[in-house]
Amino acid sequence: MAIIIGGVIGYERGHQNRPAGFRTHILVCLGAAIVSMIQDQLRVNILKYTILHPEVAQVLKTDLGRIGAQVVSGIGFLGAGTIMRDKGIIGGLTTAASIWATGCLGLSIGWGFYYLAIPAGIGIIIVLV
């Protein structure tokens, strides 16, 4: 699903000859989805471990938002690379925003929030077209 939604958004950007296109948006969406799935699996593993070893329950902690927050800020730096200034005109802001939004979509897909990701992806595409 991340490949499809990221690809549709990236196709629109590439079709408009923007600095980040088809492959970039797929990789951002897919990468964010993978990170969120890894984080969710780590949380499950920690919970299982604390059930088996209750003596470590006060030491081990899990924070569902921590890794996702790092993805969101990291993608912001990637998007910043698409922003250019030429003769006083700033361009690439929409592409930067689409990269950031695509990363957020990837996180929601990886965590299984399809009911949020699908309408949000459609909304992003409508805004870009």
Each model region followed by its residue ranges:
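Alpha-helical transmembrane segments and their membrane-interface boundaries
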Residues: M1-V59, D63-G65
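C-terminal ends of transmembrane helices
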Residues: G6-R18, F77-I90
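Short, non-helical or kinked segments that cap or interrupt transmembrane helices
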Residues: H15-V28, D63-V72, D86-A101
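Small-residue-rich segments of transmembrane alpha-helices in multi-pass membrane proteins
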Residues: L27-M37, A97-G110
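Hydrophobic, membrane-facing alpha-helical anchors
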Residues: L47, G65-T82
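Short juxtamembrane and helix-loop transition motifs at transmembrane-helix boundaries
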Residues: L52-T62, G76-K87
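Loop-to-transmembrane alpha-helix initiation sites
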Residues: G112-I122
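Alpha-helical transmembrane segments and their membrane-interface exit regions
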Residues: G123-V129
